[in-house]
Amino acid sequence: MSHPVMHTDFPGLKLLARGKVRDIYDLGETLLLVTSDRISAFDVIMNEPIPDKGFVLTEISSFWFRQMEDIVSNHIISTDVDEFPAACRPHADLLRGRSMLVKKARPLPVECIVRGYVSGSGWKEYQSSGSICGISLPPGLRESDRLPEPIFTPSTKAELGTHDENISFERMTELCGRELAEQARDYTLKIYGRARELADQKGIIIADTKFEFGVFEGELIIIDECMTPDSSRFWLKDDYRPGGPQPSFDKQFLRDYLEGLDWNKTAPAPALPAEIIAKTAQMYREALSRITGISL
């Protein structure tokens, strides 16, 4: 286990943006994405890092990007630090295993969410309206039930510290243009369809996940991350019992802990006990091992 990385600051490299988890550097023709060990919940960044989290997210994303290359191109140029531009070499030790050299795409202003099961905020919305994001669903569904077909439920991409908002597909077409919106929706459903078949063979249920897309040289490509414990809800197939919440190995463990606190879900975040940090790190490593076969 390496020393946790909360923030990066590389002399000689231009920091373009610092997101909830990733630090993005502008290398001119390309971008350098560095995945820290930060973790957020309810759109608030916690004060403590989760050891090895950056490695886990990078490896899992790389795995899924490779699996989907015949469906949609992705933004990765290389994950091998030795192939990065010379300006990155002095920082190779810190970059190794947690960074990607990527194409400079123009991101769509939406997050592309696909749900295969009724869970989380979708379950709350279904209980009150019988629908999720305006999509009517059959009556009588229980929490964590599998949906007859996966549904596409886009959201806005909120600024740091604010909350994403679910939007209709028609609103997405207004924001992105109909052609790009339809492409992103179709890619999202195809990727999810393949991923859940592959995950099923590994004893994993992908209940829902989200993707981001961008335009590079006139082509819509998938960017950011791909089906990680940060962006997905992973359940164990052997433990699946619809009718209530499911044991998961993703960020839900941390969310559940925070739900039990007297905290208003706005910054500043509460301090995380050592055992919660350790258990969260264990969940992330288990996701890596089950999905890719790689152990840390």
Curated annotation (Swiss-Prot):
GO BP terms, alphabetized: 'de novo' IMP biosynthetic process
Entry-linked InterPro entries: SAICAR_synt/ADE2_N, SAICAR_synth, SAICAR_synthetase_CS
Gene Ontology CC, one term: cytoplasm
UniProt KW keywords: ATP-binding, Ligase, Nucleotide-binding, Purine biosynthesis
EC number: 6.3.2.6
Reactions that this protein is recorded to catalyse: 5-amino-1-(5-phospho-D-ribosyl)imidazole-4-carboxylate + L-aspartate + ATP = (2S)-2-[5-amino-1-(5-phospho-beta-D-ribosyl)imidazole-4-carboxamido]succinate + ADP + phosphate + 2 H(+)
Cross-referenced SUPFAM superfamilies: SAICAR synthase-like
A GO term, aspect molecular function: phosphoribosylaminoimidazolesuccinocarboxamide synthase activity
Pathway stated in the Swiss-Prot or TrEMBL entry: Purine metabolism; IMP biosynthesis via de novo pathway; 5-amino-1-(5-phospho-D-ribosyl)imidazole-4-carboxamide from 5-amino-1-(5-phospho-D-ribosyl)imidazole-4-carboxylate: step 1/2
HAMAP family from the UniProt entry: SAICAR_synth
Family: Belongs to the SAICAR synthetase family.
Name of the protein described by the UniProt record: Phosphoribosylaminoimidazole-succinocarboxamide synthase
Species lineage: Bacteria, Pseudomonadati, Thermodesulfobacteriota, Desulfuromonadia, Desulfuromonadales
